[in-house]
Amino acid sequence: GKQAVGIEIPNKVRSIVSFKEIIENDTPAYKKMAIPVVLGKDITGEAQLLDLAKTPHLLIAGATGAGKSVCVNSLILSILFKRSPDEVKLILIDPKVVELKLYNDIPHLLTPVITEPKRAFQSLQYCLCEMERRYSLLDGMGVRDIVSYNRRIVERNIATEKLPYIVVVIDEFADLMATTGKELESTIARLA
C-alpha cells in the first residue's frame, strides 16, 4: 500500500443518488457481470456496481431507519431491470409479511413470496437439493460454473435449458432464525 490515510468528510450539501439514473446508465460493466446490482455512487460520482454472482453471501445490517430495506429493494430491482427470468430466479423470504410482498407476481420468482417459517425452511432445503443437482450437472459436463455450463450446452447443441442463477433474499433473518432454530442454521451452513 501507500503511506497515506484517506478520511471521508461529509458533504455540507447532500446530493441525491437516483436509482433510475444509475440503472439506466448502460455502462459496459453491466454486460460483464452475471448479476449486476446497484450500490450507489462513490465520492467522485461514479456508479458503484456489484456482481452478486461473485459475492454469493451478503448480509445487510444496520439500525432501524438506516435504509436496509431501501438497499434490499435496490438489489432486487437491479436484478429485475438488468436480467431476465431466464437468467436469474428469485426466492424471497419475508417472515414479517410487510417488505417483499409487492414482488409476488413477478416472473423471476421460483415461488410466491414466502412468509411462513416452515415454507422458508422447505425452500432452503430445495436450494440444497438444487445445489447438489447442479454440482452433478457441472461435473457431467466437465465445467466448474454456470457460465461455462450454459456456454457448453450451446456449443454442443444439447437440447436442455440453460441454468439460471438463483438468488435467495431473506428479510429479517434473525426473526427467521428465532422461529426455526438449528435446522435452518445447518441448512444455511451447507448452502454457504
What is each PLM-predicted segment?
Residues 68:
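Conserved lysine of the Walker
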Residues 64-65:
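The conserved Walker
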Residues 53, 80-125:
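P-loop NTPase switch/communication element
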Residues 58-59:
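Short hydrophobic/aromatic beta-strand immediately N-terminal to the Walker A/P-loop
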Residues 71, 75:
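Hydrophobic positions on the alpha1 helix immediately C-terminal to the Walker A/P-loop
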Residues 2-37, 41-43, 47-49, 54-55, ...:
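P-loop NTPase motor-domain active sites and their immediate coupling elements
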